[in-house]
Curated annotation (Swiss-Prot):
Signal peptide: none annotated. It comes from Ehrlichia ruminantium (strain Welgevonden). NCBIfam families: GTPase_YsxC (TIGR03598). Belongs to the TRAFAC class TrmE-Era-EngA-EngB-Septin-like GTPase superfamily. EngB GTPase family. PANTHER family: ENGB-TYPE G DOMAIN-CONTAINING PROTEIN, MSS1/TRME-RELATED GTP-BINDING PROTEIN. GO terms for biological process: division septum assembly. Its cofactor is Mg(2+). The keyword Ribosomal protein does not apply. The gene is engB. The keyword Methyltransferase does not apply. This is Probable GTP-binding protein EngB.
């Protein structure tokens, strides 16, 4: 099966707002995580080649639920997690979806890995490192993706990658992928890495 065709059929299933509303799948899941406004929705639309699949907002913290997308009629599930960091939502709402996200990550047996997005324009921040440390503590596999690379020079990307590699990380999956949803750069490589969960 060609890489692009793997993600070509994408169907939104549900936006879970509580533990009880989390759907029960037995097929592999790959979750997208990252800071608020890191570009998760744009990336979903880029890898599925459909601008209408995920709603894009310029306001940070727009995603306040866990969105599930069925890929290729049941080949796998792509999961869009709420962004961490700044949000215009009240504290109770933020705490609610953070707890939901933590529950999902800790209890999802069919979760193959987390694709953690880092905004290349903003850089690698302490809040990103905190999330990585949390994943490490709980032994959750993750792969890093630098987004919006069309907005920065290549030497900036090198610095970010170098900073990340300075840490002793045991559950990271390499390579670190550079992508631009706008220019479609790195999208095919990312699809390939996501599709590895199907082969397991």
């Amino acid at each position: 099966m060609k890489l692009k065709s793997i993600m070509s059929q994408c169907q939104f299933i549900i936006g879970a707002t509580s533990i009880k509303s989390l759907p029960d799948f037995s097929i592999p899941e790959v979750a997208l995580a990252g800071r608020s406004n890191v570009g998760k929705s744009s990336l979903i639309n880029a890898i599925t080649n459909n601008r209408k699949n995920a709603r894009i907002s310029s306001k940070p913290g727009c995603t306040r639920q866990i969105n599930f997308y069925l890929i290729n009629k049941g080949l796998m599930v792509l999961v869009d997690l709420p962004g961490y960091g700044y949000s215009k939502a009240d504290r109770a709402t933020v705490n609610s979806y953070i707890c939901l996200m933590e529950y999902y990550l800790l209890n999802r047996k069919n979760l193959s890995k987390v694709v953690l997005l880092i905004d290349a324009k903003v850089g690698f921040k302490e809040i990103d490192l905190d999330f990585i440390r949390w994943l490490e503590v709980h032994q959750i596999l993750y792969q890093l993706v630098l987004t919006k690379i069309d907005r920065v020079q290549s030497n900036v990307l090198d610095v970010i990658v170098s900073d990340i590699q300075n840490f002793n990380l045991n559950f990271i999956i390499y390579p670190i992928i550079n992508v631009s949803s706008k220019c479609k750069q790195g999208i095919e490589e990312l699809i390939y890495e996501i599709a590895q969960c199907i082969k397991k």
